[in-house]
């Protein structure tokens, strides 16, 4: 059993939101007396995650996955969940995570709540922002596998150094995943 997290990165650098996810997952793992396992794609120095409570990194190095589709990421994460016997998967509030989390929940027949602003209770009830953050919802997840999407800036990063193991991970992806290809990702800048 483990808490699995997907680490958002850009140009090989771990994003700030990934440290929030790691801090949140560490708090859950401490309650459940288990480990935190992170999945990284093309991150040359995943050791930085040890400072935020990550025990193990499944490190994927594959230039073909530089720009990854939600479907491909879904297949990759399914294999990571199975490999680590993960019962909880935590995502940030990134657009990529918001696209893949529902796909993964459907594939694993898992319960999914997004925009979470609290740690789960013992009965696995979580608070989440709804209606443009004007209301709070209480949701209970009672499926064997639970997928959690954090609200942006809901958790302060907190350092908790642990021993880290980095393991190469080479998931087998179906041929159909290579038919969908993300050519580029563009970010808006300046005034909108």
Q: What name fits each language-model region?
A:
Residues 1-192:
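N-terminal glycine-rich FAD/FM-binding segment characteristic of electron-transfer flavoproteins
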């Amino acid at each position: 059993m483990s808490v699995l997290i997907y680490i958002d990165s850009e140009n090989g650098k771990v994003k700030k939101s990934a440290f929030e996810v790691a801090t949140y997952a560490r708090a859950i793992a401490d309650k459940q007396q288990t480990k935190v396992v992170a999945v990284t794609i093309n991150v040359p120095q995943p050791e930085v995650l040890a400072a935020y409570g990550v025990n193990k990194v499944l490190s994927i190095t594959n230039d073909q996955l530089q720009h990854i589709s939600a479907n491909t990421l879904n297949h990759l994460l399914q294999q990571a969940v199975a490999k680590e016997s993960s019962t909880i998967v935590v995502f940030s509030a990134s657009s990529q995570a918001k696209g893949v989390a529902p796909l993964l929940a459907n594939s694993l027949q898992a319960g999914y709540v997004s925009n979470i602003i609290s740690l789960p209770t013992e009965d696995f009830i979580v608070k989440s922002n709804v209606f443009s953050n004007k209301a709070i919802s209480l949701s209970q997840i009672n499926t064997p596998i639970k997928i959690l999407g954090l609200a942006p800036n809901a958790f302060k990063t907190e350092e908790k150094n642990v021993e880290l193991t980095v393991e190469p991970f080479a998931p087998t992806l179906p041929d159909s995943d290579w038919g969908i290809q993300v050519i580029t990702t563009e970010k808006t800048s300046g005034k909108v």
